[in-house]
């Protein structure tokens, strides 16, 4: 039930609603009700373009959105990490599908906890390797197709300013989460 998930005996330390950035505030509220016992993995919109301007406008809620979602991010929490961009992977039948950043990060967090302690950042080429996606990018809003991108250093720098964690490709390492910021 809605109340049962808030009980102390429910043991979890990570929460996410993959593909639903509009539920970030609900996850923050749930975590607050549980005395901040979890890390909230937040998604950016699947259609958010990979430019510094688009990412910063969304993260700063430049469109004055009233709630989290396609138009902007309104929530913040010391327990919230927001990640960008989305990923490309395959489903069980081998077809390519687009997945939100939280899909990649939940696995990366679990892998990190297997090789290090949970308080170590799941970031960088040692503990931040993303092994459940083949590319990163976004869905082009005009064509409806996945657009593969490389999150360049300048875009990563602008993401850092607004506390959005970049997932990018590095030669010799593959796809890597390269951030450990909370919003």
Feature map (PLM): residue ranges:
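A glycine- and small-residue-enriched flexible loop/hinge signal that marks low-structured segments
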Residues: 1-183
């Amino acid at each position: 039930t809605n109340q049962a998930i808030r009980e102390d005996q429910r043991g979890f330390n990570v929460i996410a609603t993959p593909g639903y950035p509009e539920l970030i505030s609900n996850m923050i509220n749930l975590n607050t009700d549980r005395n901040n016992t979890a890390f909230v993995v937040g998604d950016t919109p699947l259609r958010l373009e990979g430019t510094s301007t688009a990412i910063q406008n969304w993260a700063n809620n430049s469109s004055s959105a009233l709630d989290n979602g396609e138009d902007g991010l309104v929530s913040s929490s010391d327990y919230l990490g927001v990640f960008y961009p989305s990923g490309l992977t395959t489903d069980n039948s081998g077809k390519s599908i687009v997945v939100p950043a939280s899909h990649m990060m939940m696995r990366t967090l679990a892998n990190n906890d297997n090789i290090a302690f949970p308080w170590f950042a799941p970031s960088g080429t040692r503990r931040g390797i993303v092994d459940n996606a083949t590319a990163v990018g976004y869905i082009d809003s005009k064509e409806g197709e996945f657009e593969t991108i490389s999150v360049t250093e300048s875009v990563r720098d602008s993401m850092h300013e607004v506390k959005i964690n970049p997932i990018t490709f590095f030669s010799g390492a593959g796809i890597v989460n390269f951030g450990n910021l909370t919003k």
